[in-house]
Each structure stands twice: as structure tokens, then as C-alpha cells.
Design a protein with these regions (language model features):
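Compositionally biased, intrinsically disordered or flexible polar/acidic segments
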Residues: 2-521
Length: 522
């Protein structure tokens, strides 16, 4: 990592905006169509763990089984097994139908070209023959980086309310270097832990997609006076990739790298009108080529609406839980598609990240150079102190800039957040707390035979319903108390009418910004 001191000239952009805009118009001699092509990755590996031969997923993508595959070697082979889940939930099929499992360490080795790669690990934490769902406890390492540690896939899936999920990382591979992924069961008191994986995907990415290009200043470090360079010796973990105001975009709908974009509904806390979908043709540029984000991200957005009085009192707000003790790359995507907005200062607004003002005059026309031209801005945030544990609600707030803007409004198209590895090379965060619900046993133990068990069944159902009502009452009480407490402090509620969050991470330990500063003295 490298640091560069921030230059004061950056803060003059709002003053020099009109001149900056004219310069962009004068010197933009290359048409946007030259940059509209999707990215063609050098390496595209999709390994269906625990299966053999070639298969096609529901989205049309080809997957190769790891048994006898030329794409990867598996060592040691004799201590692992290929398994199919005892109970197949509502999964999409490949690569979740089979898994590679072992009670001892195993390593996949991939021969790939040098450069930065997406590494995606697919998990379907179910019951497999001889393996208890709750006993999967393991770590995953790649070179000097710890991607996962003491990882409980079942807790992650349950906290998300999902049957299956993907973890995505960004890792650099040096020249003449192999890419290794080592899965190691964690020690447990019962000595019956195991590691598993359902699928592994490796896709090349452009060298400057998320990393600082050579010779560039880096990105603003929030709360500091210097820039931060993200070098290729850094590993990243994708925390969020959101199509703001839109819907989820499948990997095949991405611009060449098979990234998944989620909608922002779960994380948007209010302050905006109905999401907007524009019919504009997105004009990609050298600074923002098509591989940065698909056109659909820039065609959808959230804005505040036409009520100036209401807009002056409120924010557009997103709250995204992250792990304490790490640095985060926060990327905001912006594209002005309102045909009435074509000039500098037509729509300017203030951006806050984690309560800190990072841009006092954000303007899509200044950022990009014109209407329907996409742009993005990166910021670095340090959340807590390295070594601290728990969850933290990272906030992004946009507030209108009344008196300096024709439209008293704010707008945003997309959000991406990435975790940077710690000084020890770790990206691993804590597991979610076990959900406060009643889990059924392994399917083979669920059978109830004979009429003599009917009374037992009715009693069990009654107990479950009663416990559920008690937990619901406690949940509603907690929400009500939090809402009352939140009115007494915090800059966000000065402008924003928020709605209660039902995020699964709320069962984890969370701290406010003030509490974090008090503990860490930062």
C-alpha cells in the first residue's frame, strides 16, 4: 500500500466545474462506442466440484467436473469424497448439486495466466452422507491470504435466509505462479469438523478495475489528508454490488466478468421516490468503459423527487453491515439520464460516507462530462481498529445542495463495497450468530410413523408456535426501543426519515460510529 497527500486542488472542482466541463467537451475526440464492448477475460474457469464431465448451468454457462479435470489438480485425492446432498433444497442446479468434502486438508491448484483474478467459492450447506450440516467448520487460504477462517457456511446461509450463496474475492497471480486454494477443517472439541465446496470459479479482470493504476494518486482516505493506493499485492473481498433502483442482474447480464449485481431494496433506508428506469443509451468513455458496470446499472437509479421542501429535510440513505477492523473500498456509480439535466450545477448534492462528508458538490455532469455518460468515484473507509470484532452499519447518505443547484435533489445508480485484507493478510470476519429459531434434524431422523405419534406432533407444533410468538414480540419490542433511542442522537436523523431495518446481521454485535471512536480512541 502507498499513501499520497491529498491536493487542495481537488476541493476546487465545484468552483472550476463549468471550465472543467468545457475542457471535457473540447478534448473528447473518441466516440463512446469504442469503449462499449464487454470485457473478454483471459481465464474463465468454472469447476463443478464433486462431479465428472461437462455440464451446463441454468443460465447457459458451461461447468467442468473436478474429477479428471485438466483445469485443476486436487491433492490429496484419496482423502476427499464427492457427495450429493441428502436433501436437495430449491437450488438452481449446477454447481450446487454435488460437493467436494473432506475431514482433512485438501488443495486445488490452477494453472492460470498472470494478473488479477476473481475467485468465487460456491457453497450449498446441506446434509451430505456422513456429514452433519452444522459440523462444516473450516478455513480457506490462497497463498499469503486467509480468505475464510473457522467458517460456518450453515450460519451464513441461515442468516441470509438463503439455501446457497457465493463468496467472491480478488487475488493477483504473479508471473509463473500457480493459484492454490487450500481448504482446512478447523479443530473442534468433537473432532468431527470438515471442509467442503460446491463450485470454484476463476475469471480474469482488467488490471485497473478496482486497483490503483500505475502513476495515479490513489483514492481519498475518508477522515485523512492523504490518498490511498490499492496495489495488486492486496486481496479484496466483495461485500456488496448493488444496482441501485433496479433489480438483480445475473452473471450472464454482466459486462464480461460474470459478476452478480443485487438490488438495493434490503439496504435502502428511505428518503427517495419510486426508482427510475431510463431508456437512455449509455455512452461509455475511456475513463468509464463498459466493463466497469453494465448499462442497466447506469439506466436505473434512485432520486429524491420533485418536492424541494421535503428534499431539504431528508437524505437518500443506505445502511450496509460490514465487519469491524478492516478497510473498505466504497465505489459509487453515477450517470445523469434525466434529459432535462445537461449543465453543471443542474443537480448537485452532498455525499456522506460513515457520517463524513466526502463530496460537498457531487455533480454527474462534472464527474462524466455530459448526460448519459457514466462515471464513478472511489473512497476508502477504515471501520474500527484492526483486531476489533463485530458488525458495523456503514452508512451512505446523499443530501441535496439547496442554493447551489437548479434541482434540489440527489441521485445514485450503483454501489460496490470491497473489504481489503488486514496487515496479517486476512479477509476473514466472524460468523453470524446462530438464528433464534428451531432447526430440524437430519432428514433421516425426521420420520414419524403411526397414529400414536399424533399427540406428540400436535404438542411439538404448539411449542414451535408459542416460541415463535415470543420471539416475534421480543423483536418488535427491540425495534421500537431502537427507533426511540435513535431519535436522540446521530446526524443522519436530522435530515432522514428512516425505516426499521430487518437485516439478518442485526443479531450480531454492532457499534455506532461514536461508540467505535470511544473504544478505539480513533
Amino acid at each position: 500500500m502507498k499513501y499520497r497527500r491529498q491536493h487542495k486542488s481537488l476541493f476546487c472542482i465545484s468552483i472550476l466545474g463549468p471550465f472543467y466541463f468545457l475542457l471535457l467537451q473540447c478534448f473528447s475526440t473518441v466516440t463512446a462506442s469504442n469503449y462499449a464492448a464487454t470485457y473478454n477475460p483471459t481465464d474463465t474457469i468454472a469447476l463443478d466440484c464433486g462431479s465428472t464431465g461437462n455440464s451446463t448451468a441454468s443460465d447457459g454457462r458451461a461447468w467442468t467436473g473436478d474429477i479428471g479435470s485438466i483445469l485443476a489438480t486436487l491433492q490429496p485425492l484419496d482423502t476427499t469424497i464427492a457427495a450429493r446432498a441428502i436433501r436437495q433444497g430449491p437450488v438452481e442446479g449446477i454447481p450446487y448439486l454435488t460437493a467436494r468434502m473432506s475431514s482433512s486438508q485438501f488443495t486445488y491448484t490452477f494453472l492460470v495466466s498472470a494478473g488479477l483474478k476473481f475467485v468465487r467459492l460456491y457453497f450449498y450447506p446441506s446434509w451430505y452422507p456422513g456429514f452433519d450440516r452444522s459440523k462444516a467448520l473450516f478455513s480457506v487460504k490462497s497463498g499469503p491470504f486467509t480468505l475464510l477462517s473457522n467458517f460456518r457456511a450453515d450460519l451464513v446461509a441461515d442468516s441470509l435466509g438463503l439455501e446457497y450463496f457465493v463468496r467472491e474475492f480478488c487475488i493477483n497471480v504473479e508471473e509463473n505462479q500457480l493459484l492454490n486454494l487450500t481448504f482446512s477443517p478447523s479443530p473442534s472439541s468433537s473432532n468431527d469438523s470438515y471442509a467442503f465446496v460446491n463450485g470454484i470459479e476463476i475469471v480474469s479482470m482488467p488490471h485497473n478495475l478496482y486497483y490503483t493504476p500505475a502513476g495515479a494518486d490513489g483514492i481519498p482516505f475518508i477522515g485523512q489528508t492523504y490518498f490511498y493506493e490499492i496495489e495488486n499485492i492486496t486481496a479484496l473481498e466483495t461485500m456488496y454490488r448493488l444496482d441501485v433502483g433496479g433489480h438483480s442482474i445475473s452473471p450472464t447480464g454482466d459486462s464480461g466478468m460474470f459478476r452478480f449485481w443485487s438490488d438495493d431494496n434490503q439496504f435502502f433506508m428511505g428518503g427517495g421516490v419510486i426508482p427510475d428506469k431510463a431508456n437512455s443509451t449509455i455512452k461509455y468513455t475511456k475513463e468509464t468503459p463498459a466493463y466497469i458496470a453494465p448499462a442497466e446499472v447506469y439506466q436505473t437509479s434512485r432520486s429524491m423527487g420533485p418536492n424541494k421542501t421535503w428534499n431539504m429535510r431528508n437524505n437518500l440513505t443506505w445502511v450496509l453491515p460490514v465487519d469491524l477492523g478492516f478497510r473498505y473500498l466504497v465505489r459509487l456509480h453515477l450517470c445523469e439520464t434525466n434529459r432535462a439535466i445537461t449543465q453543471v450545477s443542474d443537480r448537485q448534492f452532498i455525499i456522506y460516507i460513515d457520517g463524513e462528508m466526502v463530496d460537498e458538490a457531487a455533480d454527474a455532469i462534472i464527474w462524466s462530462g455530459g448526460n448519459s455518460i457514466p462515471a464513478y468515484r472511489d473512497y476508502l473507509a477504515m471501520i474500527g481498529f484492526e483486531g476489533t470484532q463485530g458488525k458495523y452499519n456503514l452508512s451512505i447518505d446523499l443530501h441535496s445542495r439547496a442554493g447551489f443547484s437548479v434541482y434540489v435533489d440527489a441521485v445514485l445508480n450503483g454501489i460496490e463495497i470491497f473489504k481489503l485484507n488486514s496487515t496479517t493478510g486476512s479477509l476473514a470476519g466472524p460468523n453470524p450468530e446462530p438464528p433464534k429459531t428451531i432447526f430440524l434434524n437430519e432428514p433421516s431422523q425426521l420420520t414419524i410413523k403411526g397414529s400414536s405419534n399424533k399427540k406428540t406432533t400436535f404438542i411439538a407444533v404448539g411449542v414451535i408456535v408459542t416460541v415463535g410468538l415470543v420471539l416475534l414480540s421480543l423483536r418488535l419490542y427491540t425495534m421500537f426501543r431502537r427507533q426511540r433511542e435513535s431519535k436522540d442522537h446521530g446526524y443522519k436523523l436530522k435530515f432522514t426519515e428512516t425505516k426499521a431495518s430487518l437485516l439478518p446481521w442485526e443479531v450480531c454485535l454492532q457499534f455506532s460510529k461514536a461508540e467505535t471512536k470511544e473504544v478505539t480512541h480513533v
